[in-house]
Amino acid sequence: MKKQIKVLAVLSTAMFMAAVTPSFVGTASTAYAKSVGWTEENGNWYYYDSYGEAITDTWKKNGDDWYYLDSDGIRAADRQIDEYYVGEDGKRVSMKWVSVENEDFWDEDDAPEFLYYYYGRDGKALTSRWASINGSWYYFNEDGIMQTGSITVDGYNYYLGEDGSRKTGWILLADETDDPEYVESWYYFDNTGKRIENEVDKKIEGQYYTFVDGRMQTGWYKLPAQAAAESGEAQTATPSEAAPAAEQTVAGYQYYDEDGKRASGWRTIEGVEGISEEAELYRFYFKNGKPYHAEKGLELFTIESRKYAFNTKGEMQTGKKVVNLEDGNVANFYFDEEGVMKTGKQVIFDEDLGETQNWYFHTDGSRKGQGFHGIKDNVLYVYGLRQEADKDLRFAPVELNGNQYLVNSNGAVQKATSSSKSNAMPELGSGYKDFKDENDKVWTVNTEGVIQSQNTAQ
């Protein structure tokens, strides 16, 4: 009876040990040999084979989980094993992120404190590939390290956030260049994460932008030769250079606002460097980014039913200007401070002469806006300028279309009546009249105001 109690006590002890020991339990062979299977010794786990030897440098499966026995036969924990990783419990991880302290953190500038890996379904770290994880895309290099920041993969540039996720859309990034012009620039990444590199007028959310080496362009931009053609398609862009001063034209340029959008409508800005005067503001008008400009001299453009003049530099004109006409001729025009072409009577101050002048410009028809050339309301105009005699002389001759007319200081043509007669030339009969200026010159005119003779008073 005592023997039975002793056996029960041993069995009870064995059952208790089995209850508190993990599933790593082997089978005893002899009283002095190691058990086959898992054994815990001094806090470490080992696996013994049928010869009682601890297996080393190999993976061992237990149930659904894999474990690694190192060179000392100790079950590894919380470490990388080639392309695998075992957690604190020794199990090989899968479908899981793992962070590892970066050994170079203290030795390299901008080195991350931790390196991140992702272990796939087979337990291997993802390497040299993209991976979609929980709805976001990540890239892992050849060592399996999750990448951040700007990277190049298969010739395409991408940007990964601090969390490693691939970014799309607009991103403001510091420029890695010594050029003081570029401190930081805007870049755009499409819906696959690829950076837009060199493209003219890329349409993004209804607006047009141009990129050179990925940088969004602002201000004046010289189009590549192939972009000048009206193909209607997005073009390849290359870095722009200021046009030589000798060209003096904005042909081939486009303008982009500070937010990168292609300009349309009016802008008050500096002109193209090397073409317009530096540090001066001018008015420009843009259509699809291109400035209205003359091919030579000054030309007229219609904007919202109003006429404006622009030079070859694209600068809007004000004041009295000589403008090229479509037929190859030129004409005088007048533009107010807003650049709008004026018609009818205009009083204009001539800064060069330091005097106020009276002008008249056609009010309608194909010559609208052009300086009037001829006699209107008995006032004589030459290419728009009212011809006037010096007030001290009272009268002066003016040539118009091959005839000499006599005008007074108000520009009025001096005419004879049908019944008046000339004292200086009585032989002419009726329809002539004499006018004497302050120099005692006598001018004889007919009913049209055409001078018939000039004599000195006796």
Where are these regions (language model features)?
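Extracellular adhesion/carbohydrate-binding repeat motifs centered on closely spaced tryptophans
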Residues: 2-458
